[in-house]
């Protein structure tokens, strides 16, 4: 563990804090470049955010690169990165914020240049599909998009599109946060009646983690069982392992090479923070995640068509991959993929970071028993309640920081009941223990039902989902 003792006590003046933030930012980048342990990186990021919070408290201003306290701020955002521009740190591997409310998603929309999913777009989706919008849309869990109106234009004009999402299989067991994109993607598949490709990036996990190729592929197959248990239509869904599919699909590999030719090393360093010490596999991997965005990567499904647009539901931290993809697409003659971005599923300890499979106490796993779920929620779920019952009754709880309430916004279908819980908890009529009980009563059957469905997923079913084949959709 790196020595962080120079962080909070040793830096009194704003100028000392300024230099400490710069040094801590360099440490974070160095740890990521050296592939340090996740807990070491997380600890360094937390210290960085703490220093920035102290700096803002001391100066009344956000920390800005190359702008010591007392100097005027730069006129443009040039030179600012995600670590230094504000208090949120978001990339495909790390999500941290100093705010107990979680990431400021409005700022993230501005930073990433995407568009907010507003009421007008939600209503248009409802009109186009004839279905009530999913609770993830109604509640702003999927909050941002790129070109969703184009997808709806295509759908309304009887033009085809397809869905693409994925999973990085880093462990055998998935947690409930991993379900979010798949729950929503299943709904999209159902209401639009379109085919879906699901990429298992076992090659990525081999490159980033201390895994053998066989372990990475094994995790992909095991994770595929959990994904299949979400209820996807076997006649309209193709799940593929990169390690498996790349060697049997010339069309897929040709698109990977096209993308690689049109993205420079300097660009991927700028987008993903790669350094000269990263292996060349990492440098080239973004092209592999980009390739499923183009329909002719799957000739068994789309034949030789290159004009079928793709819609990608994913968490917002994956957007850098697809900003790169959208930049390349017109240069190689393909339509840009559209995207729907979700918020992060918070860790049990609070919304400052997302749930992680590497920390068993921060996660509710899909393999957990009813007893384990109850214990984890009661023991670890961060509360927005007051210190005493008397104070809570008088002042009420804070739903904006309460993890149990956050989880209910993801998994409780009944809007009226959710609103009643919010009112009761905010007013003090409902105590923290009662709120946690509500969550436990939602999570226990949800996970038990998932486990029952997963038991029905045989090796033969997995093989069928993962076999390249024509899907039940006519693209002529």
Curated annotation (Swiss-Prot):
Cellular component terms per the entry's GO annotation: cytoplasm; cytosol; nucleus; protein-containing complex
Sites of N6-succinyllysine modification: 159
Alphabetized PROSITE patterns for the sequence: AA_TRNA_LIGASE_I, WHEP_TRS_1, WHEP_TRS_2
A Pfam family the protein falls into: tRNA-synt_1b
Bilayer-spanning residue ranges: none
Predominant subcellular localization, coarse grouping: cytoplasm
Gene Ontology terms: biological process: positive regulation of gene expression; positive regulation of protein-containing complex assembly; regulation of angiogenesis; tryptophanyl-tRNA aminoacylation
Matches recorded under CDD domains: TrpRS_core, WEPRS_RNA
Enzyme class: ligase
List of residues that carry Phosphoserine: 356
Keyword Ribonucleoprotein: no
Compartments reported by the entry: Cytoplasm
Entry EC no(s): 6.1.1.2
Motif ('KMSKS' region): 354-358
Motif position, 'HIGH' region: 169-178
InterPro entries in alphabetical order: aa-tRNA-synth_I_CS, aa-tRNA-synth_Ic, Rossmann-like_a/b/a_fold, Trp-tRNA-ligase, uS15_NS1_RNA-bd_sf, WHEP-TRS_dom
Ranges where the record places region Dispensable to the catalytic activity: 1-117
Annotated stretches, region: Disordered: 63-83
PTM per Swiss-Prot/TrEMBL: Proteolytic cleavage generates 2 forms; T1-TrpRS and T2-TrpRS.
Recorded catalytic activity of this chain's protein: tRNA(Trp) + L-tryptophan + ATP = L-tryptophyl-tRNA(Trp) + AMP + diphosphate + H(+)
Keyword field: Aminoacyl-tRNA synthetase, ATP-binding, Cytoplasm, Ligase, Nucleotide-binding, Phosphoprotein, Protein biosynthesis
Domain WHEP-TRS: 13-69
Function per UniProt: T1-TrpRS has aminoacylation activity while T2-TrpRS lacks it. T1-TrpRS and T2-TrpRS possess angiostatic activity. T2-TrpRS inhibits fluid shear stress-activated responses of endothelial cells. Regulates ERK, Akt, and eNOS activation pathways that are associated with angiogenesis, cytoskeletal reorganization and shear stress-responsive gene expression.
Family of this protein: Belongs to the class-I aminoacyl-tRNA synthetase family.
Official protein name in the record: Tryptophan--tRNA ligase, cytoplasmic
Species for this entry: Bos taurus (Bovine)
Gene label: WARS1
């Amino acid at each position: 563990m790196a020595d962080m003792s120079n962080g909070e006590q040793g830096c009194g003046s704003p100028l000392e804090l300024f230099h400490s933030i710069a040094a801590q930012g360099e440490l974070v980048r160095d740890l990521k470049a050296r592939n340090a342990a996740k807990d070491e990186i997380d600890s360094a990021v937390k210290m960085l955010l703490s220093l920035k919070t102290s700096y803002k408290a001391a100066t009344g201003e956000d920390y800005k690169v190359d702008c010591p306290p007392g100097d005027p701020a730069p006129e443009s955002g040039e030179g600012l990165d995600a670590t230094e521009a504000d208090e949120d740190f978001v990339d495909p591997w790390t999500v941290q914020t100093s705010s107990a409310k979680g990431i400021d998603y409005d700022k993230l929309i501005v930073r990433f240049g995407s568009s907010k999913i507003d009421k007008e777009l939600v209503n248009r989706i409802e009109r186009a599909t004839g279905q009530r919008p999913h609770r993830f849309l109604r509640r702003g869990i999927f909050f941002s998009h790129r070109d969703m109106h184009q997808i709806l234009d295509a759908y309304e004009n009887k033009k085809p599109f397809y869905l693409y999402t994925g999973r990085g299989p880093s462990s055998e067991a998935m947690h409930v946060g991993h379900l979010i994109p798949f729950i929503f993607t299943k709904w999209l598949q159902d209401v639009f009646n379109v085919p879906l490709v699901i990429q298992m990036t076992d090659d990525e996990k081999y490159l980033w983690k201390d895994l053998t190729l066989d372990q990475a592929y094994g995790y992909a197959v095991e994770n595929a069982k959990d994904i299949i248990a979400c209820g996807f239509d076997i006649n309209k869904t193709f799940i593929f392992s990169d390690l498996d599919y790349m060697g049997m699909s010339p069309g897929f590999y040709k698109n990977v090479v096209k993308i690689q030719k049109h993205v420079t090393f300097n660009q991927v360093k700028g987008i993903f923070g790669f350094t000269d010490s990263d292996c060349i596999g990492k440098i080239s991997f973004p092209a592999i995640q980009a390739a499923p965005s183009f329909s002719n990567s799957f000739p068994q499904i789309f034949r030789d068509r290159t004009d079928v647009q793709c819609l990608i539901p994913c968490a917002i931290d994956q957007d850098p991959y697809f900003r790169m993809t959208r930049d390349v697409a017109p240069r190689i003659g393909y339509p840009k993929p559209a995207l729907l971005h979700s918020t992060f599923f918070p860790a049990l300890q609070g919304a400052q970071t997302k749930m992680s499979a590497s920390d068993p106490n921060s996660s509710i796993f899909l393999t957990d028993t009813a007893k384990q779920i109850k214990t984890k929620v009661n023991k670890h779920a961060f509360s927005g309640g007051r210190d005493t019952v008397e104070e809570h009754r008088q002042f009420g709880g804070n739903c904006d920081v309460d993890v149990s309430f956050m989880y209910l916004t993801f998994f409780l279908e009944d809007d009226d009941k959710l609103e009643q819980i919010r009112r009761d908890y905010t007013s003090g009529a409902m105590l923290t223990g009662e709120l946690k009980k509500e969550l436990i009563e939602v999570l226990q059957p949800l996970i038990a039902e998932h486990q029952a469905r997963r038991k029905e997923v045989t090796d033969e079913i997995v093989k069928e989902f993962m076999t390249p084949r024509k899907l039940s959709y006519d693209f002529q």
